[in-house]
Amino acid sequence: MSITGQPHVYKKDTIIRLKPLSLNSNNRSYVFSSSKGNIQNIINHLNNLNKIVGRSLLGIWKINSYFGLSKDPSESKSKNPSVFNTAKTIFKSGGVDYSSQPKEIKSLLEAQNTRIKSLEKAIQSLDEKIEPEPLTKEEVKELKESINSIKEGLKNIIG
């Protein structure tokens, strides 16, 4: 029997064998509603079903691998479940131990506050290093002229 005769999924040029759903029986029946009942339509329909089921299975593997519930058999770089076992322990133990969280949060807040304080000190030291640009006589004259023109305009409007 060839490999393609058994349930399988193609991913990245590899064939991943799947367990059949019913181990003891091999009686499969398919019902097709098609305007043309030829073998090519049935083959196309089965190929579409295989693609849909295969993509769904690969997505489920990826999600389970991401949450650490199982290892993705198609990815050699997939992490083992022992690395990311937080979701697995939450579901198994029935919840999270909240007594340890305040300690973790306190240490995180302290680290964050020290980081913020060091950034504020760095900003203050940079502000002290920046010197304001001195005004030139031309800029002062332009400012006086613009103020005088505004005053004259107001006198003309008010009367």
Curated annotation (Swiss-Prot):
InterPro entries named in the record: Caulimo_AT (IPR004917)
Stored Pfam families: Cauli_AT (PF03233)
Family membership noted in the UniProt record: Belongs to the caulimoviridae ORF II family.
Described purpose of this protein according to its UniProt entry: This protein is involved in virus transmission.
Record-given protein name: Aphid transmission protein
